[in-house]
Curated annotation (Swiss-Prot):
It catalyses: guanine + H2O + H(+) = xanthine + NH4(+). GO terms for cellular component: cytosol. Keywords: Hydrolase, Metal-binding, Zinc. The gene is guaD. This is Guanine deaminase. The keyword Lipid metabolism does not apply.
Length: 450
């Protein structure tokens, strides 16, 4: 057995996380120790004898040669939860968040989205928006995010640099689109392939394990066959993740059918071009057939559930229960700016509403619980990005990506009362909490400014 690294910091108090879906562990009187690499080396919970807890604190500090006053964080009546994982966000669209919600997907792209994304050829404009969106995500407790950038190589690299400076964990994708796009916002096939390869190489060369490239064909209608073949090959060669959109909107699905009449389904299009595998994240997936769900499960592809966007653009409601029963990796996505809110807490709430809506028409449907939704925002997301061995909860050996939540902060959006259990207070935070309750944020053990 390998010797554990030296512990440099201890967190003492209530810890809340999930190990399996549907079960939230609420662990009072807990003790977590992390090393200089931000890896959890010690985790013990539910001390019944508080004197023993304090003895263990003193012993760990002594054994590791650290000062108890400087190295122990007593959370008091606050609690610790894992960082949220946003599995689908369009960083440039943050400029439009909260506006342009009056149109369905394809018209929305044409009127609002492509015009703003085309502006990111201006690096001053890009730096302003990208700095703000990353800061906002962090303030809402998002420690890991899958970002779509734009078609612009330099601006996409700039987003990666901003993310790296802020200390966020992220996957950054230079968007690829070489057809069926506006004249002012489109690449040639050669440009898209060349710039994407260059982008991937540049990000990998930076050597930051927290910030990785992700191959990003926008969606099948905007990418030629030649481009999709090249992107599939690139992802295989570099072993990067892949992200795209699938079956978000019925008009989109009909469009794909007209483009690929000889291929069985929209999902099969991605498989045809080697873009559907265990490293792939498909956003939305609202209108999948049973055969497509089976294919996604077989391919070990992940789905990013984006309920705010699905509601806002009138795209439809994903049947989350059906996806979970098919043993598909599933996480949550804000989908800024189709989704108007950057907070994964809000996505959790809308995912529950979305699931409840299926019960209206099917009394046998089992709606999503808040415990299950919390799992999707943490462990579920970690599985989607293939980092469940590193993040998602507080198991020893994982990185310490965490939020300290203060339910009693001045001007908290909710109130707590005598006699309430820790579960009551946690549930209030899930339904009523916001960025005001975020006291501290850590990514791989580093305290993040927000």
């Amino acid at each position: 057995m390998m010797k554990a690294n030296k512990i440099i910091k201890l967190f003492k108090g209530t810890v809340i996380h999930s190990i399996e879906i549907g079960k939230v562990e609420i662990l009072p009187n807990s003790l977590i120790g992390i090393d200089e690499d931000g890896v959890i080396q010690h985790m013990k919970s539910n001390y019944e004898d508080l004197k023993q807890l304090e003895k263990d604190v003193t012993m760990i500090c002594t054994d590791n040669g650290i000062n108890e006053q400087e190295s122990v964080i007593d959370m008091g009546n606050k609690f610790l939860i894992p960082g949220f994982i946003d599995t689908h966000a369009h960083a440039p669209q943050y400029h439009n968040a909260g506006t342009g919600t009056d149109l369905p997907l394809l018209k929305w792209l044409e009127k609002y989205t492509f015009p703003v994304e085309s502006k990111f050829k201006d690096l001053i404009f890009a730096e302003n928006v990208y700095g703000k969106v990353v800061d906002r995500m962090l303030r809402h407790g998002t420690t890991t995010c899958c970002y779509y950038a734009t078609i612009h190589l330099e601006a996409s690299e700039l987003l990666a640099e901003i993310v790296s400076k802020r200390g966020q964990r992220a996957f950054i994708g230079k968007v690829c689109m070489d057809r069926h796009s506006p004249d002012h916002y489109v690449e040639t096939t050669e440009q898209s392939i060349s710039n994407t390869k260059e982008f991937v190489d540049r990000i990998l060369a930076k050597g930051n394990p927290l910030v990785q490239p992700i191959v990003t064909p926008r969606f099948a209608p905007s990418c030629t066959d030649e481009l999709m073949v090249a992107l599939g090959n690139l992802s295989h060669e570099k072993q990067t993740l892949i992200q795209s959109h699938l079956s978000e909107n019925k008009d989109e699905i009909e469009w794909v059918k007209s483009l690929y009449p000889g291929i069985e389904s929209y999902t099969h299009v991605y498989k045809h071009f080697n873009l559907l595998n265990e490293r792939t994240i498909m956003a939305h997936c609202v209108h999948l057939s049973d055969e497509e769900i089976k294919l996604i499960s077989t391919q070990q592809t992940a789905i990013s559930h984006c309920p705010i966007s699905n509601f806002t653009l009138s795209s439809g409601n994903l049947d989350v229960r059906k996806v979970l029963e098919a043993n598909i990796k599933l996480g949550l996505g804000s989908d800024i700016s189709g989704g108007y809110h950057p907070s994964i807490l809000q996505v959790i709430r809308d995912s529950i509403k979305c699931s409840n809506s299926h019960f209206f028409n099917n009394g046998n449907h089992t709606p999503l619980t808040f415990e299950e939704a919390f799992y999707l925002a943490t462990v579920g997301g970690s599985k989607v990005v293939n980092l469940d061995h590193r993040i998602g909860n507080f198991i020893v050996g994982k990185d310490f990506d965490a939020q300290i939540i203060d339910p009693f902060v001045q001007n908290s959006p909710f109130d707590c009362f005598d006699g309430e259990t820790l579960k009551d207070i946690f549930q209030k935070f899930i339904y009523l909490g916001d960025d005001r309750n975020l006291s501290s944020l850590y990514i791989k053990g580093n305290k993040i400014k927000f």
